[in-house]
Regions:
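Sec-dependent N-terminal signal peptides
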Residues: 1-3
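Chitinase-like catalytic core of GlcNAc-active glycosidases
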Residues: 23-276, 285-288, 297, 301-304
Length: 304
C-alpha cells in the first residue's frame, strides 16, 4: 500500500524555477494518503528552523502521485520570518496551483493550545472583551481571522488541529466553540465540503476535546510513530465511538536526519517485518481511512 516512493515523484530534485506540467490523478474513494511536507527543508527556505549543514534539495514539485492531501508543516522561529517568506510566496503562486491541478488538497497544522485556546483568549482581549463575554459572532470573527491568517493567505484548502495535550474542561469549552465556528467555513459541515478540508490529528486517545465536535472533521489522523498495528487497533476502537472507521487514518514516519532522540524505526528492513507493512495491512484489512506519512523526503534514508 505504501509503494509510493519519492523516486516516483513528478520531477527529481526540482529546482526553484521549475514549473512542471501537472497530470491529474484519480481519487481513491474514501481512502486517504496524506503526507507531511517539512517546509524548512524546501529548496526555497534556507537556514530556517535547522542547523543542518547540507543544502535543501526538495521542492513541492517532487511530491509523488497517489497522495491526496499534503500537510504543510513548518515552525518559523522568531527572527527568521524573512528567510521563510520565499517559501510561502512560492507556495501561493506556484506550488499550490500545481498541486491543485493534480487533485491534491493542502492543509496546515495548528497547535491546539496555541490557536484553539490561547489564541482565542489573546484575540478576544484585543477586542476589549473576555472569554466569559464572548458571543457566537466573536467566535465566527475569530474563525475568519484564523482561516485568513493560516490558510487562504497562502492558497491552502484546509486546516489541521494538532492535539498532543490534555486540556481541562474550561479549555475544551473554548475549543469546542472555536472549532464549531470554523466548521461552518471549512470541512464536511461547511458550505464547501468538497473544496475544503478540516482535520484533527493527535498522538493520543484523550477524547474530551474531540467528542462533542467529532462531526466537524473530515477525518482523524492518528500519530502512532514507532508502533505496530496493536496500537492502531486500540486507538481505532476508541475513536470509533464517535466516527466511522473510514475516518480514522493512522500514520507513521520516515527517519528524520540527525534526530538523536526519536528513533521510531517504522521504515525497517525487511519490509514485510516493518511497522509500515503491518499498519498499512491492518488499515486495508479493517477498512480504515488510509494512512499518512511524516517527512516524506526521508523515504529510504537513515537517522544520520
Amino acid at each position: 500500500m505504501l509503494g509510493c516512493s519519492l523516486a516516483m515523484g513528478t520531477v527529481a530534485n526540482a529546482q526553484e524555477g521549475d514549473s512542471p506540467v501537472a497530470a491529474s490523478q484519480e481519487g481513491n474513494g474514501n481512502k486517504h494518503f496524506m503526507v507531511y511536507y517539512r517546509a524548512w527543508r524546501d529548496v526555497t527556505m534556507k537556514g530556517v528552523n535547522t542547523d543542518l549543514p547540507d543544502d535543501n534539495w526538495i521542492s513541492m514539485y517532487d511530491i509523488p502521485y497517489g497522495i491526496d492531501v499534503v500537510n504543510v508543516f513548518s515552525y518559523v522561529p522568531s527572527g527568521q520570518e524573512a528567510a521563510a517568506q520565499p517559501f510561502y510566496d512560492k507556495l501561493k503562486s506556484d506550488y499550490a496551483p500545481y498541486l491543485h491541478a493534480r487533485g491534491i488538497k493542502l492543509v496546515r497544522g495548528l497547535d491546539y493550545s496555541g490557536v484553539m485556546v490561547d489564541g482565542f483568549k489573546t484575540w478576544i482581549a484585543q477586542q476589549g472583551k473576555n472569554v466569559d463575554s464572548a458571543t457566537e459572532s466573536d467566535y465566527d470573527a475569530y474563525a475568519d481571522h484564523v482561516i485568513e491568517t493560516y490558510m487562504t493567505s497562502v492558497g491552502l484548502d484546509g486546516l489541521d488541529i494538532d492535539m498532543e495535550t490534555f486540556p481541562d474542561a474550561a479549555q475544551v469549552a473554548i475549543s469546542d466553540q472555536v472549532i464549531t465556528a470554523r466548521a461552518k467555513r471549512i470541512g464536511p459541515k461547511s458550505d464547501n465540503p468538497v473544496g475544503t478540508t478540516f482535520l484533527y490529528d493527535t498522538n493520543g486517545s484523550y477524547t474530551a476535546p474531540f467528542k462533542i465536535v467529532s462531526d466537524c472533521f473530515d477525518y482523524v489522523a492518528y500519530q502512532q510513530y514507532g508502533s505496530d498495528s496493536n496500537r492502531t487497533a486500540k486507538a481505532a476502537a476508541t475513536y470509533e465511538q464517535f466516527i466511522d472507521s473510514t475516518k480514522f487514518v493512522p500514520g507513521l514516519t520516515f527517519p528524520e536526519e540527525g534526530d538523536m532522540n526519536n528513533r521510531w524505526n517504522d521504515a525497517t528492513e525487511p519490509y514485510l517485518d516493518s511497522h509500515f507493512y503491518d499498519v498499512a495491512s491492518y488499515s486495508y484489512d479493517h477498512n480504515l481511512g488510509g494512512m499518512f506519512v511524516y517527512a516524506l523526503d526521508r523515504d529510504g534514508r537513515t537517522y544520520s
